[in-house]
């Protein structure tokens, strides 16, 4: 209303342009205001979908978790993720991924965030980051037969959240070398 009082209608062409600009601005403000209800509704639906696959504490819509997962070592930031999921077991992941897809969320798997590729940086505000840091099971080196390879090959089972130093140490104990980038061996996750 105050803007209308200040409009100069003496130049009809200019006034028409101002009118269009005001129309676009009002529409943008209404869309922005409506986005809060839409985001809240999506959060409710997503939380309900995630609830049958993981504990509620593993579903993080809070600002701290979301900002902490907005980038990797590149410090390149595009968007803040919609939600951060931190499953307790690998068995939870298929259901969480399915729930993300059904909710229209882009899925981003993330380890320790030490990468320099930007591959874990959300490019849309509707991204779900699945943090694998709690998935820490580590087996021992065992010989395995692999298709197309003669003889047995030393293998080591790890879950996605195992810190590389632990893998390197397990290989060393078994008499093998697991080559790593030592600058981040204590932070980098398999």
Segments and roles (model prediction):
Residues 1-190:
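Noncatalytic alpha-helical scaffold of FAD-dependent oxidoreductases
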């Amino acid at each position: 209303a105050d803007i209308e009082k200040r409009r100069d209608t003496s130049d009809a062409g200019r006034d028409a342009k101002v009118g269009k600009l005001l129309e676009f601005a009002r529409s943008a403000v209404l869309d922005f205001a409506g986005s809060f209800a839409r985001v809240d509704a999506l959060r409710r639906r997503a939380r309900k979908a995630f609830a049958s696959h993981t504990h509620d504490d593993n579903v993080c819509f809070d600002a701290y978790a979301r900002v902490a997962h907005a980038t990797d070592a590149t410090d390149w930031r595009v968007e803040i993720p919609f939600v951060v999921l931190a499953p307790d077991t690998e068995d939870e992941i298929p259901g969480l991924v399915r729930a993300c897809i059904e909710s229209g969320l882009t899925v981003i798997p993330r380890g320790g965030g030490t990468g320099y590729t930007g591959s874990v940086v959300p490019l849309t505000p509707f991204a779900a980051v699945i943090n694998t840091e709690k998935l820490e099971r580590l087996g021992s080196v065992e010989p395995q037969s692999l298709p197309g390879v003669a003889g047995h090959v030393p293998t080591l089972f790890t879950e996605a959240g195992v810190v590389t130093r632990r893998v390197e140490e397990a290989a060393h104990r078994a008499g093998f070398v697991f080559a790593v980038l030592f600058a981040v061996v204590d932070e980098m996750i398999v």
